[in-house]
Design a protein with these regions (language model features):
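N-terminal export signals
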Residues: 2-6, 11-32
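Ser/Thr/Asn(+Pro)-rich, low-complexity disordered segments
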Residues: 13, 37-438
């Protein structure tokens, strides 16, 4: 793919804007409103489901282990079956990868000493060698040298995704060097600088032109940025930044939830690390909000069945991904992007804890009935059963969200590990989170 066709998710969104499975939707809506918060590991599922999720996690880990440079920085993308020559890494993919290394060590996917040394090397490079501005990193870098790629931005969201992985590693590994480096990397970030005098955070900064005009001022994947900033012991954000961003709502066939006109991943990313189950702030229970968003997205896909006959109870899910024409932000409701019948596996994979039986059925259907959609690193980024198009690539962030949410569904491991960080707890406390009482 031409490098010029590679865009960030948020750039595309800015451009666009400038057993419940068998129930009728009316009953799905009622079910979503009444759903009880339970630990994912307590949700009953079969041994075959567990085996598939383990395979999903192992293959994703293979990507993060194999497709990383000597610096530990994970590639933005690679060919589905390896033997890839891309050298561009994404700091967001590295954040998912660091969390994946914690899963791999806990599950014995590789020897502990090998994994510990990989984590050490990754953090050393982040602290000593990777260019930064006030602690924030460039979105895309060369995986071997750390050099900025494509004149990309210093990214507040991608730095936050990286930091979530850094803090997960600090909590999981008892190695003193890992803990020290992780603390320093997080502590160096100057969160108020990214406010640039405003009430909400900028999406990024360019050395050539300064801060981006676009701001994190409306609900999306932004919660992790503000919570990390609020919890910072060195350069904290003021508490009022949590209430400064808007929380618009969508009402789809009677089910209302907080969302912008954004793809499904915006309801997933912060929740891969921050555990919102059974908690709420002054506005919402955001875990339940993501349950509703997933229920509605499934029904939205089913409503397109006449246009795209392959969409069914067993096969649905669209979120930002590659398409046959290049990377695109698409989904709904409301309808976003030039939908063409493609299926994006990480849409279901990233929502496993929110709508487990339905999402698991999608992954099983793809694995069993679309063999070209599976390879060395797991599921392709996207495919189109209507046209027969299969993406030759996988994306690190899409493998990453599926891996982390699969593990959260199985054991809650990433939630339980990350939330032991006192900074994560402090951030949620400053934002006003408290237990949700029935």
């Amino acid at each position: 793919m031409d490098n010029k066709a590679w865009f960030t998710r948020r750039e595309l969104l800015r451009a666009a804007a400038l057993g419940a499975a068998a129930l009728p939707f009316s009953q799905l809506t009622a079910w979503a409103r009444q759903r009880q918060f339970v630990e994912p590991a307590r949700v009953p599922y079969s041994g075959s489901d567990d085996a598939l999720l383990d395979e999903v996690e192992r293959t994703a880990f293979d990507f993060f282990w194999t497709e990383a440079g000597k610096t530990g920085q994970a590639k933005d993308r690679a060919l589905l079956n390896g033997n890839d020559t891309h050298t561009v890494a994404s700091i967001a993919a590295t954040g998912f990868g660091l969390s994946g290394l914690c899963i791999a060590e806990a599950r014995g996917y590789r020897k502990k000493d090998e994994i510990v040394e990989r984590v050490r090397g990754t953090l050393r490079f982040l602290w000593r060698d990777l260019p930064h501005e006030h602690g924030f990193y460039y979105h895309f870098i060369d995986m071997n040298t750390g050099a900025r790629q494509w004149k990309c931005e210093i990214s507040s969201i991608d730095t936050s995704l990286l930091l979530c992985g850094v803090l997960t590693a600090r909590q999981h590994f008892s190695d003193p060097e890992i803990q020290d480096l992780a603390t320093k990397i997080y502590g160096r970030v100057d969160w108020p600088w990214m406010l640039n005098g405003g009430k909400t955070l900028s999406m990024g900064w360019h050395p050539e032109s300064g801060f981006l005009n676009a701001r994190w001022n409306q609900y999306c994947e932004l919660m992790m940025i503000y919570l990390l900033g609020l919890g910072s012991p060195t350069h904290p954000l003021p508490a009022e930044t949590w209430t400064a961003w808007k929380r618009p709502t969508i009402n789809f066939q009677g089910l209302e939830y907080i969302s912008g006109n954004d793809p499904l991943f915006t309801h997933q990313y912060s929740q891969a690390w921050f555990d919102f189950r059974g908690k709420r702030d002054a506005y919402a229970n955001y875990f339940m909000n993501s349950v509703k968003a997933t229920v509605v997205h499934k029904q939205f896909c089913l409503s397109l069945h006449d246009e795209f006959p392959d969409y069914s109870e067993h096969l649905w899910g669209i979120t930002s991904s590659d398409s046959a024409k290049g990377y695109t932000a698409w989904g709904g409701p409301p309808r976003l992007g030039e939908l063409d019948g493609s299926v994006v596996p990480c849409a279901a994979g990233g929502s496993l804890p929110f709508l487990y039986p339905d999402c698991m059925e999608v992954l099983r259907t793809i694995k069993e009935h679309y063999p070209k959609a599976w390879g060395r690193y797991g599921f392709v980024d996207a495919f189109n059963p209507l046209t027969g198009w299969y993406n030759p690539d996988v994306l690190g962030i899409d493998l990453g969200i599926t891996m982390l949410m699969a593990e959260n569904q199985r054991t809650g491991f990433i939630w339980n590990t990350f939330m032991k960080n006192k900074e994560a707890q402090n951030g949620m406390n400053k934002a006003g989170f408290h237990p949700q009482h029935a």
